[in-house]
């Protein structure tokens, strides 16, 4: 569909009589039968006649066939045919207000550790008071006024200072743009469904990163049908999406197709052309940055950033993507003053949503390119310049929040500065260029730290120990190729001595622990939270999708806490009962045996020199004693964990969970009401991020001055991500993220509008995904900082790994050619234009 004319219907005469669909579903059918998208996805699941499409390629009808052969022939006949859709009057594209707008202003104290004069966490983020010509109108700045007015007063102060800076300041202004890309998940969107009209039951198999969202929203959608669907039997399955299958609308199209399948099972599945045409895209960004630095000290002073992202024609996660982009733009640096705003525009492009990197890829890569240019202007080594300005533990981010734990980006920088690729770069450049006439050699560096989590992270986990010592795990998280099904199983070993024997993921039935939610965890008032939390089953958010690099830290928390409860209230009492059995208190009596001395060793559990007890023996004892053999927990994190008091074994315990059910040996699960709950204050939403993991990447390139072709000779990454649960999975994430970052920097590109994927003609014949030959597959190396201790939590790192290589490559090209590119991707034709 074109997005500048009225839609007037479809013409299927090209199919003749033999290839007409057995069922044609249009917007009129959906309206008659009461079927519509959940509110999150907006209006017009299928476009009604007489309306202008909201975006290029918007769906207008579903054609259903009872046999595959006719379907295949019909599909081939219609593909790439423009006459099938009929248009009316020219209207121009729809003009709409932005999908989301955010602004974060901070003015720190005289020193980094002093109290802020103004910040989002201490005071408030700033939101527009209205829209004018579809652009935000900000509050009037006023010292001592309302919080948002005071914020704008400080924003004005920052702008004035950058306009007329002190003599010792260097102020640099640059514009950066990044492209729209397809996440290129190699499983296209699909759904298998069957509607049993006799029982009014819909069976649906869908690959999704957010099974709980489908399980929650789809029954509501189907309940409004005329007549209502009585039951949904949902089968979420493993998938791969890189974000594109998180809160995506395809499952709802699959459900609708099944509803009109005339009793037949229906498969709705994109081919690769259709996947390019309809799948969620990464947001294209346009960024204007202004950064001030003290010329004498080389210390950053102020950062003003304005970003716009193209959110496409249907709002998805655009508001949170632009929010995350703004709050991440500082990268690894401390800025005493900052004013960062981001706007997510509505356009006629394909809808953009969650994609690996989630706005930070765009904003942080730009910061890293600019920092390199500032270092060159000041004639300071780029890594030394970074070290002078790196955010250190206890310093505040641009929202005024202190990040969690030790910030170790400085260690990453110090390690990179000592790497031979960096130390030998001048010598290698001279040698390479003398041996390869016609090629230019360059080395570049980038280092970022990215948040993991969303500020409303929730999950369920249920762990059970059988009398035979078998461990069973149920988890709400979805496996999407990251290996979380392996890592969550492995985590059980910390408390139970071995990985889970049986594990289930994308679990949507949590009747063993009934929790309820209401309100929006991001915008609710403190008064509302205080009122709602008096219900012991209430939680601010029910269940998170697999997204935001959340499995290693957040999903692991629920798994570990469930396993810990079985150890504390089942296995440890069982172990003590065995060790203390016999005359005079048994083998334990002569020694001091504490729970904190417990260790799993080969063969079982020991503590303070006690006999090693196998898990099977412990389980048998636990079941004889009737201890806790199963625990189901719900957890919530708003940049810190919710805690609650529960009565266990007659004692009150405060646990970092907000819901709990336990199963005693031989019994059924029983929900334990919490006595008191301690949710993080709603003001903590303004922190926007507190958890970080850091990665630095060195890249070595050769540029052919005749063709502009960039050859990636080698790259080395240094990562800090706490304790590794499964090192092989971390390595896989690092290598895969690097490949995606290389593609973003050098190869992948989609036009946004009429020439882009919305026209249905895009496939991998036109879209260059990086291959092994593009990523230095046999030469790349990595270095992972050891954890500070065995108690360090694992950190989410699946997104951060793809970001620094983008800046490293662009900085390396600048080192090779002498020209700084600011628009991504940097392709051969862009380099040829400059060199010739």
Report residues per predicted region.
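Phosphate/diphosphate-binding loops
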Residues: 59, 66-67, 263-311, 555-584, ...
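Thiamine diphosphate
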Residues: 233, 238-269, 277, 484-492
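Flexible, low-hydrophobicity surface segments
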Residues: 1-124
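Helix-loop-helix junctions that connect adjacent transmembrane helices in secondary transporters/permeases
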Residues: 107-222, 390-468, 683, 697, ...
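C-terminal catalytic domains of large/alpha subunits in multi-subunit enzymes
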Residues: 27-30, 224-229, 259-266, 322-438, ...
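Short, aliphatic-rich beta-strand segments
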Residues: 201-206, 470-475, 712-714
């Amino acid at each position: 569909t074109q997005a500048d004319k009225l839609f007037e219907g479809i013409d299927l005469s090209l199919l003749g009589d033999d290839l007409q669909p057995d069922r044609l579903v249009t917007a009129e059918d959906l309206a008659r039968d009461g079927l519509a998208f959940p509110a999150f996805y907006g209006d017009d699941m299928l476009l009604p006649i007489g309306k202008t499409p909201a975006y290029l390629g918007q769906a207008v009808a579903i054609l259903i066939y009872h046999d595959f052969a006719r379907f295949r022939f019909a599909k081939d006949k219609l593909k790439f045919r423009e006459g099938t859709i009929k248009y009316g009057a020219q209207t121009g594209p729809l003009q709409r207000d932005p999908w989301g707008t955010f602004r974060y202003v901070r003015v720190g104290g005289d020193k980094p550790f002093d109290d802020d004069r103004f910040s989002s966490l201490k005071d408030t983020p700033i939101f527009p008071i209205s829209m004018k010509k579809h652009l935000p109108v900000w509050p009037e700045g006023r010292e001592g006024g309302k919080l948002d007015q005071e914020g704008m007063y400080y924003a004005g102060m920052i702008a004035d200072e950058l306009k007329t800076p002190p003599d010792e300041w260097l102020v640099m202004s640059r514009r950066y743009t990044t492209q729209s890309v397809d996440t290129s998940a190699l499983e296209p969107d699909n759904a298998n469904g069957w509607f049993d009209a006799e029982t009014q039951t819909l069976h649906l198999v869908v690959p999704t990163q957010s099974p709980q969202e489908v399980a929650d929203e789809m029954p509501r959608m189907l309940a409004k049908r005329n007549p209502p669907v009585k039951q949904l039997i949902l089968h979420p399955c493993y998938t791969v999406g890189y974000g594109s299958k998180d809160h995506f609308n395809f499952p709802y199209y699959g459900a609708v197709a099944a509803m009109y399948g005339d009793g037949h099972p229906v498969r709705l599945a994109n081919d690769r052309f259709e996947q390019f045409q309809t799948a969620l895209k990464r947001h294209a960004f346009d960024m204007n940055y202004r950064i001030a630095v003290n010329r004498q000290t080389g210390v950053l002073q102020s950062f003003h950033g304005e970003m716009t992202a193209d959110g496409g024609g249907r709002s998805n996660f655009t508001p949170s993507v632009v929010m995350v982009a703004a709050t991440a733009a500082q990268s690894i640096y401390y800025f005493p003053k900052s004013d960062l705003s981001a706007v997510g525009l509505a356009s006629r492009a394909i809808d953009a949503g969650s994609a690996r990197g989630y706005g930070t890829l765009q904003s942080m890569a730009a910061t890293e390119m600019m920092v390199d240019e500032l270092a060159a202007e000041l004639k300071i080594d780029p890594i030394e310049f970074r070290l002078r300005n790196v955010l250190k533990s206890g310093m505040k981010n641009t929202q005024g929040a202190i990040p969690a734990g030790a910030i170790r980006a400085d260690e990453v920088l110090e390690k990179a500065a000592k790497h031979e690729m960096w130390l030998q770069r001048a010598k290698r450049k001279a040698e390479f260029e003398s041996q390869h006439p016609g090629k230019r050699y360059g080395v570049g560096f980038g280092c970022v730290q990215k948040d993991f989590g969303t500020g409303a992270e929730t999950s369920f986990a249920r762990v059970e120990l059988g009398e035979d010592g078998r461990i069973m795990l149920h988890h709400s998280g979805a496996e999407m190729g990251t290996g979380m099904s392996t890592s969550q199983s492995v985590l059980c070993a910390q408390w139970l001595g071995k990985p889970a024997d049986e594990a289930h993921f994308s679990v949507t039935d949590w009747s063993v622990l009934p929790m309820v939610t209401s309100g929006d965890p991001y915008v609710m008032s403190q008064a509302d939270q205080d009122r709602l939390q008096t219900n012991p089953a209430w939680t601010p958010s029910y269940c998170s999708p697999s997204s935001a690099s959340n499995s290693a830290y957040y999903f692991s928390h629920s798994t570990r806490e469930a396993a810990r409860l079985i150890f504390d209230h089942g296995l440890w009492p069982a172990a003590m009962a065995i060790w203390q059995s016999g005359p005079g208190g048994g083998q334990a009596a002569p020694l001091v045996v504490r729970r904190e001395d417990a260790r799993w060793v080969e063969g079982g559990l020991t503590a303070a020199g006690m006999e090693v007890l196998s898990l099977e023996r412990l389980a048998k004892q636990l079941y004889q004693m009737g201890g806790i053999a199963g625990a189901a927990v719900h957890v919530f994190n708003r940049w810190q964990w919710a805690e609650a008091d529960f009565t266990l074994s007659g004692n009150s315990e405060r646990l970092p969970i907000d819901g709990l059910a336990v199963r005693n040996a031989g019994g059924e699960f029983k929900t334990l009401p919490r006595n008191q709950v301690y949710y993080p204050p709603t003001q903590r939403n303004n922190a926007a991020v507190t958890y970080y993991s850091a990665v630095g990447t060195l890249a070595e390139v050769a540029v052919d001055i005749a063709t502009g072709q960039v050859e990636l000779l080698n790259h080395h990454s240094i990562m800090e991500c706490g304790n590794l649960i499964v090192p092989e999975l971390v390595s896989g994430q690092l290598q895969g993220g690097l490949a995606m970052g290389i593609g973003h920097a050098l190869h992948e590109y989609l036009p946004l509008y009429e020439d882009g994927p919305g026209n249905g003609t895009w496939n991998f014949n036109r879209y260059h995904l990086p291959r092994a030959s593009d990523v230095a597959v046999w030469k790349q190396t990595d270095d992972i900082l050891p954890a500070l201790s065995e108690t360090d939590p694992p950190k989410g790192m699946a997104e951060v790994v793809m970001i620094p290589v983008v800046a490293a490559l662009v900085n390396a090209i600048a080192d090779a050619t002498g020209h700084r590119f600011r628009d991504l991707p940097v392709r051969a034709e862009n380099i040829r234009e400059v060199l010739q």
